[in-house]
Amino acid sequence: MFHGYHFGEGILKNKILLVSALALAMGMNAAQAVEKSANAKTVEVVVNANDFPFSFVDDNNNITGYDGDLLKVLDQRLTDYTFHFNAVSRDAMIVGLSTGAYTLAADHFYLTKERAEKYDHSGEPTGISDLRLIVRNDENDIHNLGDLASGKKKLVPIHTSDARYTVIENYNKKHPGQQINLQPNGEQSAADIFKAVASGEYDAAIYPIGALLALNKALNLNLKASDSVGLFPNVYLYKKNTDPQLIKAIDAQLVALKKDGTLAELSRKWYAEDVYALPGASDVKVNTDWE
């Protein structure tokens, strides 16, 4: 089931929306769905309604994207749980998770110490973010985070609840003499972030390359990406004191979906790259060692 609002932007029409109509290679057809228990518990699941290609609501009012498709696979595979889908803004997701309105939130979240203290989280990655610096094609001075700092380049502001903010914040802590100008901002879609770089308003953005690969040609932005800044595990966030059996059941399915290639297929479908084939991907784990 799905509760949310209709979302339709021009950038998600035409060829991009054709992607959401493709059948998944694994785990998505009715024949593979398990029969639900008569006592299956309903889980309130929430995704971001406007975060292509991670999750969004298409012109037919369907939740889709990497997170949307993965949650549908999980819902079909879980015997003792059934998902009720919600799609809202990122801020509303966090509020609803904090108040207990939602049990599980999916928005390619990175795990931070603050999030681990405030919420429960999956013990297995739901995906991998290949984080890059996104710059204009004619920008030849930015190749890494150090170039942002030494060149006093303008970085697109980042929402403080986004772990990309923490990545830059941690860099600044380790380099007190060479700081990146980090500014907070409200919610922005990937398209808006990339447009801010393409227009020259900012020099660079830090963002998963999958979103750039999915949007660059469609929006004719003439952007390119640096080498990888790092591979980061994505996690589900759960409301505090969530039934540990639910988390355990979903973690077990995530392991199985990685093993059978479903996660790699979703990555190719939505990010235009198989993040699981990247060097170091096999070593990406959910880490709670904050030191």
Which residues does each PLM region occupy?
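Ligand-binding clefts/hinges and TM-proximal coupling segments of bilobed small-molecule sensing domains
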Residues: T82-H84, S161-L182, V255-E291
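Extended ligand-binding regions for polar small-molecule ligands
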Residues: G68-L78, E139, G146-D162, Y236-Y276
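Extracytoplasmic small-molecule ligand-binding "clamshell" domains
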Residues: V34-F109, G186, I250, D260
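Periplasmic-binding protein-like
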Residues: N48-N50, G127-R132, D138, K217-V255, ...
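Short helix-initiation/N-cap motifs at beta->coil->alpha
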Residues: H84-V95, H143, I180-K195, L231-F232
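Bilobed "Venus flytrap"/periplasmic-binding protein-like clamshell domains
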Residues: A49-F52, N60-Q76, R132-Q179, Q183-S189, ...
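A ligand-binding cleft/hinge motif common to bilobed small-molecule-binding domains
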Residues: A92-V95, A106-K118, V167-N170, K195-L231
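Acidic, polar ligand-binding/catalytic clefts
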Residues: K72, H84-A149, L223
